[in-house]
Swiss-Prot record:
Record keywords, A-Z: Cytolysis, Host cell lysis by virus, Viral release from host cell
GO BP terms in the entry: viral release from host cell by cytolysis
The protein's name: Lysis protein
InterPro entries named in the record: Phage_T4_GpT_holin
Record gene name: T
Length: 34
């Protein structure tokens, strides 16, 4: 993981949101496939 920074750039927030969405989607697919 990257070291935490005090100031966040828009790209950091965007990647964070995308990472969360991909993880949520992956979890949803696993639960739906059961």
């Amino acid at each position: 993981m990257a070291a935490p920074r005090i100031s966040f750039s828009p790209s950091d927030i965007l990647f964070g949101v995308l990472d969360r969405l991909f993880k949520d989607n992956a979890t949803g697919k696993v639960l739906a496939s059961r």
